[in-house]
Each structure stands twice: as C-alpha cells, then as structure tokens.
Amino acid sequence: MHPTIKTMLDVVAKGDEDAIKDLLAEDVKFKPPTYYKTWTGRDPVAAVLGHVGHVFSDFKYRRIMGEGVNWACEFECKIGTLDAVGVDLITLGNTGLIDRFEVVMRPYKSVGALREAMNQRVMRDARFLGFKDALS
C-alpha cells in the first residue's frame, strides 16, 4: 500500500486537519458527496476534511482497493443516528501526494444529514469566507 494512503487511513477519521494537509498536493481537487462542486487547494480541502472528521462517528474503512496512483477506500460511518457507507476515490500525483479526492456515499438521507451538519460547521468557521474562490 502506498504510504500516503496508509497514513490517510489513520488520520482522516480523526479530523486532524494538519495531518490531512500534509497528504494533499498544493492544487488538490476535492469533490464532496453533498453537492456537485469542486474544492481546489490544500488549505480549503484540509479544512473541509477536518470538519468531516468531526461530523462522522464510528468511522472505519472496510476495504481498500488499488495500486499505483489510483485508490478506492470503502468506509462506513454514522452521521448522527443514521448509518452511511461510502467510497473515497483517490488519485495520487507525481509527488505521491493526493491530487484528486472524490467521495461517493449512500443512502440519500444520510448524505442530506451530512450536508446539513457540514453547513452548520462551515458557517461558523470564518476561514471559509476566504475560501469562497476555492469552490467551483
């Protein structure tokens, strides 16, 4: 397993924004499961993923598939009292850092709960005023 993926498996669920940031390429692109937009840049993506780590509970990776630069990491978690499953689709760049990170999840009700919880957290985080240009 690639060292970046191995480390990611340990830090994402903890919401450790600094540790997550160390795994991201400068121009990383992140596609969340809650809307069809893309976050671009190490700082905003680390901030989003840091918040996710605090919204999810009982998070664990179930299966890891991939080799080289392309990886799929299947997970399960809770959002409040709702169960969810998802997959992190990750592409590593030439430097071995995460260049592209896309999350797909189900069921729909859990994704809605994630969106609501994330909106509440992001609205209270003043850094996101500066990150508005990172969303396209």
Language model segments and positions:
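Short acidic-aromatic low-complexity motifs
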Residues: 1-23
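Exposed alpha-helical structural elements
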Residues: 4-7, 19, 44, 110-113, ...
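Hydrophobic pocket/interface hotspot
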Residues: 8, 20-21, 28, 41, ...
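A solvent-exposed, acidic/Ser-Thr-rich amphipathic alpha-helical stretch
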Residues: 17-19, 23-68
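A beta-strand edge to alpha-helix "cap/lid" segment located at domain peripheries
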Residues: 53-61, 65-136
